[in-house]
Amino acid sequence: MAADNSSSDPHAPGPQLSVADVVIVAVYFAVNMAVGVWSSCRASRNTVSGYFLAGRDMMWRPIGASLFASSEGSGLFVGLAGSGAAGGLAVAGFEWHATYVLLALAWVFVPIYISSEIVTMPEYIQKRYGGQRIRMYLSVLSLLLSIFTKISIDLYAGALFVHICLGWNFYLSTCLMLVITALYTIAGGLAAVIYTDALQTLIMVVGAVILTVKAFQQIGGYEQLAAAYAQAIPSKTISNTTCHLPRADAMHMFRDPATGDLPWTGMTFGLTIMATWYWCTDQVIVQRSLSARDLNHAKGGSILASYLKMLPMGLMVMPGMISRVLFPDDVGCVVPSECLRACGAEIGCSNIAYPKLVMELMPTGLRGLMVAVMMAALMSSLTSIFNSSSTLFTMDVWRRLRPRAGERELLLVGRLVIVVLIGVSVAWIPVLQGSNSGQLFIYMQSVTSSLAPPVTAVFVLGIFWRRANEQGAFWGLMVGLAVGAWRLVLEFLHPAPPCGHPDVRPALLRTVHYLHFAVALFVLSGAVVAAVSLLTPPPAGVQIENLTWWTLARDRPSGAKTGDGPASQKHAFWARVCSLNAVLLVCVNLFFYAYFA
């Protein structure tokens, strides 16, 4: 089967869309727009809280679905399946590890954020540490990361999928999704984003389940996958090398700390630091939890999202591995000329694993469903980024430039920022087309490991250590930025060598895994924060009131009911339900880790 498909050109126009495919895609867009318009009309959009935080009246189900959908952009669909095809199961740890930090978000971080009555994460930092320079730095850093990593990766992967599957013009498909996404984001604010995310989560899960079932029907079952993956070797290889061989530890989650591509030490400690930044301090994610009507709904949303985050192992990673088994000459190619033929990138074609599976296995009609799934993944991620970036710029940058700006002006600026983001995104497409598609997932993780740990250190110390002050936080961020940027520059100047070439990169890149580097950078930044804080005056007591775990007001305005009435009893009951579900969730997560260890 692989030989029969090895000569196909994914960049040529895909199969002709049937009437059923066209109808499914059209219905998806129509329903998506209808949900966006309905939620826009339903929500209050004429106040800052209504537009940016959905009036703080969201229930746990749409919050959980939105948390999941916001993190499952098209870049993750393509990237997880591609990494699964290239290296096996361990990449699923990036998804499963979210369980613990999502629980930390709801039980630790959100109570403090609600108590501090903030809208953005940099706003919390400004309240906690004082001054404006840290808040401005974090706002600008978040905006840049959104444009050049989140938006760029999702746009490239989503457009690549549609281009390969349907043969649509790359620019046309990208611009169409951008415009439709931006329309209801501009119109409805966070409420529209969360409700459309809930719809798109359903579409993503249903479509991915159908593809996974059909993929396993082709291969047999899990044991057959393990045996077949070990033999998924392309017909053309590079002599005297082993890069064409599947990893011996492909079916294991925990890998050697020194030789593993995803060492267990890095996946345990380094990933925790990076995941804490993403799930507990990143505006895109935290904004959803801040929209909850009370703390129980925030907890319920985190629990639902954590359960959903268990799915990508079976819905993305394993299908990627099956794709390599079925199409080893394309997905598993190692010879540069063969890879160039298969996907247009000399370094490898693992990122075509998911779209290749869709095109070869899905029948007419269902192929249109999978196109809708990828559009859902892309648009969910983009709506989240657009709305959160708009919030950051409006609340942290524009209000700083124009402190007397009224609500009408802030809302107008928030909508205009989305238009600017669209322009930057479209202008970035040629750069994405020239980038190395084989490095998308690694690129995203490397950037995160170099820039996120200092931010995590500042948030964690700010919440748990009352002595941390503004001078310590600022210099911790600056030192961390300098060291992280140094490694990033080295990575861009010295990319990983292709198969068959010696690794002559600097020792920092050759011997220190990016997940291990994240740990070192976190420790360094935290040490600088602590040292400078101890050498300078402590923050005043009023400055940390309601802003740290130890000074948190227990009567915080979280929507919690007090007293002995029915409302209070109901609130206490659901608080216990959330806690029991959290314990059950951790047990399920640990079981899966142990099973695939």
From Swiss-Prot:
Similarity remark: Belongs to the sodium:solute symporter (SSF) (TC 2.A.21) family.
Membrane topology: Multi-pass membrane protein
PROSITE patterns for this protein: NA_SOLUT_SYMP_2, NA_SOLUT_SYMP_3
Compartment(s) of residence: Apical cell membrane
Function: Electrogenic Na+-coupled sugar symporter that actively transports D-mannose or D-fructose at the plasma membrane, with a Na+ to sugar coupling ratio of 1:1. Transporter activity is driven by a transmembrane Na+ electrochemical gradient set by the Na+/K+ pump. Exclusively recognizes sugar substrates having a pyranose ring with an axial hydroxyl group on carbon 2. Has likely evolved to enable renal reabsorption of D-mannose, an important constituent of oligosaccharide chains of glycoproteins.
Phosphothreonine PTM positions: T149
Identification of the protein by name: Sodium/mannose cotransporter SLC5A10
Modified residues (Phosphoserine): S49, S142, S146
Topology, Cytoplasmic side: 38-73, 122-150, 196-201, 287-301, 389-410, 466-472, 536-576
